[in-house]
Amino acid sequence: MEAFEISDFKEHAKKKSMWAGALNKVTISGLMGVFTEDEDLMALPIHRDHCPALLKIFDEIIVNATDHERACHSKTKKVTYIKISFNKGVFSCENDGPGIPIAKHEQASLIAKRDVYVPEVASCHFLAGTNINKAKDCIKGGTNGVGLKLAMVHSQWAILTTADGAQKYVQHINQRLDIIEPPTITPSREMFTRIELMPVYQELGYAEPLSETEQADLSAWIYLRACQCAAYVGKGTTIYYNEKPCRTGSVMALAKMYTLLSAPNGTIHTATIKADAKPYSLHPLQVAAVVSPKFKKFEHVSIINGVNCVKGEHVTFLKKTINEIVVKKFQQTIKDKNRKTTLRDSCSNIFIVIVGSIPGIEWTGQRKDELSIAENVFKTHYSIPSSFLTSMTKSIVDILLQSISKKDNHKQVDVDKYTRARNAGGKRAQDCMLLAAEGDSALSLLRTGLTLGKSNPSGPSFDFCGMISLGGVIMNACKKVTNITTDSGETIMVRNEQLTNNKVLQGIVQVLGLDFNCHYKTQEERAKLRYGCIVACVDQDLDGCGKILGLLLAYFHLFWPQLIIHGFVKRLLTPLIRVYEKGKTVPVEFYYEQEFDAWAKKQTSLANHTVKYYKGLAAHDTHEVKSMFKHFDNMVYTFTLDDSAKELFHIYFGGESELRKRELCTGVVPLTETQTQSIHSVRRIPCSLHLQVDTKAYKLDAIERQIPNFLDGMTRARRKILAGGVKCFASNNRERKVFQFGGYVADHMFYHHGDMSLNTSIIKAAQYYPGSSHLYPVFIGIGSFGSRHLGGKDAGSPRYISVQLASEFIKTMFPAEDSWLLPYVFEDGQRAEPEYYVPVLPLAIMEYGANPSEGWKYTTWARQLEDILALVRAYVDKNNPKHELLHYAIKHKITILPLRPSNYNFKGHLKRFGQYYYSYGTYVISEQRNIITITELPLRVPTVAYIESIKKSSNRMTFIEEIIDYSSSETIEILVKLKPNSLNRIMEEFKCTEEQDSIENFLRLRNCLHSHLNFVKPKGGIIEFNTYYEILYAWLPYRRELYQKRLMREHAVLKLRIIMETAIVRYINESAELNLSHYEDEKEASRILSEHGFPPLNQTLIISPEFASIEELNQKALQGCYTYILSLQARELLIAAKTRRVEKIKKMQARLDKVEQLLQESPFPGASVWLEEIDAVEKAIIKGRNTQWKFH
């Protein structure tokens, strides 16, 4: 009986609202109930106001019953049922199992001066009962000993009935505890407890008797509590409501009941959360998480220790754990560092039901429905099953991704440089077109054309044409999305933050009224758009057609392929070439270079024609724009989506670089005349054709700007710089400012990618410091061109530093005779730089380089000059003792002779381990001073970058007190001052291996010379080499063939010049006899010369053959006239002049004989010439190195 102590706390009966809550009707947030008894139970919201104190009365009695069930759970006599009923305002709760002990309570009897029994104390005396002082492992929901008393104090009448197996106790309590009738005690073998009561409804704000709605609401709420209890007590105990068993005997059933209305298709995940230590391990928690996009905020139902608690640390623990997993999974899935998800986001689509017992908790809040326990209890002892978290997280992330997609669909941005068509978005919206201009200059052209309406009423105008700028570049949307397959099999395309915030693309979406969730398959869907089509207005160059237009097409294909299918995406095809014939005002226009080439071949001469190129829209002047816009509709071409387009979009713009690399290994197949005619006849362009021609051409051009050709080791920019330098400095090799020379290159070599990048390339081409890319720079730098200290980034401004051609090296490495034989790039119809050079030595393996492009990585480490010279000489010289050995190696694709990395200007060491070489820096240790002095760094490691990398290494800096850099641009002197007693510890922690000692390991004084030998091929595309030998072997035939071509061409030119000089000498001898001065005109004179067997010759071609091929020389040189004779002056007919010509003929004949001899020499024509040129290059390099590449 000691458990039922009584407290003298009489005032509690007066302060009735202290624990029960408000004593009148109020709005209770989240109040729910079960109104029907259908097969599928459903919790519905209760919208009417109710009294918290009344609900507390019912709740306290129900919690007492579940407490009793838990207390008897492990005893022989268990609680097998709890019967709850509510009828006509009367509430009843009964449970079997041991009843309340029926015994006299001495203390209470003494105070009351009558016989008082334990059941009366438990139900009628405040702060009395078993819940006043609970043990730490207690899992009862009751607290403070006031629960049942609240019910009694707020009841008109109540009947307490309990039986303990020996006696049955019945007691009536009336008038809110004012009248407590003596109990009736009778013998009985039953065991149960039942509480029946009629609350004081009227005083709590209700009708008396209850109205139908009040009865219905209260019954629904009590039914809900009964269902909650069913989940709490589990299968061993049956909960009845109004004589019918509740069907929510599990946490999943309870979760379904709560979410059947709001999220009938929600995904339910269940788990048992266990603890690792007593008393918590004795009471695992059951959890069900319903995940659905229908939920907009986190909600939970917690039945802990039988109490429906509204908040608690257990919920906080669950939310935080879920959030951590969801955030991690979300980031892994979306692969977008800029996308963040918050705790609110990660849990907003979850409804969690938690059921179970937690020992030692406290109840706070006015109604004692807020769970309180130290949060670290959950962190320390409870663990949530990973399978539950994984499956639930997958569902949550799927919903988050879907919500992001929908949310981003309505993202608004400020649309710059947009002019709306007057009829856009109106009844005639489908007649409007949005002109998407590449940039500001294109907008200016469009504005000029669209404002011609007054003079050209039938042309386009702002009535039906809007304008928007593409800003000169478009984001590749294909690489900014993540495709995710949800549990239901649906594929969600999630745009990353960069894409959704992209002002250009988002501006197009807003202006057109596009919806990412609409496919636009039907006319009804397309009719909702603000424009009937979009027309791309881009330059006719690779950047415009190949890149910008390709990316715009890819964007529409990615999100709205149906719009391309239905002809929504178009382009303005402007003339690329106009030919103005002298005396005519209307030009002949060509839209493709192939069309012009075909036309030009049919013309006898273009002497009276002016050919103008228009790669940029800004190149068209006003009168040409007016002409274009008169026929505007004829220039609008529609894109079509053919079968192969989908794959090609993926190849060129997707993330799989291997597919793109396979495609870009080959060059572009130009459009045929038939294809261009077909395009013009229907004004339709298949997307696949655009991708295979324009986009591929752009990609290959981009590669050539970033990866060198294996024949000359140069990118396109460096080749333009060299060609421009040879031309610019040909007559006078005086120094020029970098920015001035850059302007010359841009002008004469047609460089279109900005002066900043061009000037940077010029500076790099003149850099000659230890570790620079070029061991053999093509320019001599005057001024500060950067140093090893900052890896060349400390070069002076292009306005202040100057260059001049390294002519002694250039003239020997790139013989002038070769320039007439190389293929050339033509820009706007004019010859620019060679497509590639073929230097005397393989420059591609003589210099350093590194750059990525389109999935390829290019990395080379210069090879030893002596090894290269030995290999090339052995290949050329048949008398070389290694000649046959090398040819055998080439034939069988093996390596015999060495080809080591270059150690020029490097004071460190090179070592080979396995298939790779490694470079090592050097150091000196002063144990007395506790200092390591670094005297050389690994190859191509800039000083400042090296020091920063060491400082960022925390495990190294623990041993370092200070790093001092005394290095110059030529030498390395870095002092590493160690902390006391650090040297031995360094030796222990940074182990010495075969490949590096402890200090080399500690100070990172080693790097691997790993190569990626990917180069551009002569006819475009990429070739992948495995070894430097392969590059050499591939280069050799090109250089060898060049000597044969050079000699054959010289042979043809010499023969023609001998023919011409011989004819002139003959004419001098016969001039008196012919006496051409007596004839009236050239025609007569030419006839006489022809009759006397003088050959008609093309004097200009023979004297200056320049780029003419042997075929052209043989065809055109003998199809000339007699100007070479008729233009002779009198002094050229003198004997002395004739004598000089005869001597000239002899010299030419001697040279011709020599050329014929060279053509016949072994092992191939011109071998001896090559050897001579190798010697000349070597001599120039030695001089360059001896003079720091100044050559003086």
Swiss-Prot record:
Record field: catalytic activity: ATP-dependent breakage, passage and rejoining of double-stranded DNA
Regulation: induction: Expressed in the early phase of the viral replicative cycle.
Residue span(s) of domain Topo IIA-type catalytic: 707-1174
Entry keyword set: ATP-binding, DNA-binding, Early protein, Host cytoplasm, Isomerase, Late protein, Magnesium, Metal-binding, Nucleotide-binding, Topoisomerase
Active site: 800
Cofactor: Mg(2+); Mn(2+); Ca(2+)
E.C. number: 5.6.2.2
Alphabetized InterPro entries for the sequence: DNA_Topoisomerase_II, HATPase_C_sf, Ribsml_uS5_D2-typ_fold_subgr, Topo_IIA, Topo_IIA-like_dom_sf, Topo_IIA_A/C_ab, Topo_IIA_A_a_sf, Topo_IIA_B_C
Taxonomic superkingdom: Viruses
Entry binding sites for Mg(2+) 2: 539, 541
Family designation: Belongs to the type II topoisomerase family.
Annotated residues for binding of Mg(2+) 1: 438, 539
Name of this protein: DNA topoisomerase 2
PANTHER family in the record: DNA TOPOISOMERASE 2, DNA TOPOISOMERASE/GYRASE
Cofactor binding, per record: Binds two Mg(2+) per subunit. The magnesium ions form salt bridges with both the protein and the DNA. Can also accept other divalent metal cations, such as Mn(2+) or Ca(2+).
PROSITE patterns the UniProt entry points to: TOPO_IIA (PS52040), TOPOISOMERASE_II (PS00177)
Cellular-component GO terms for this entry: host cell cytoplasm
Pfam families: DNA_topoisoIV, TOPRIM_C
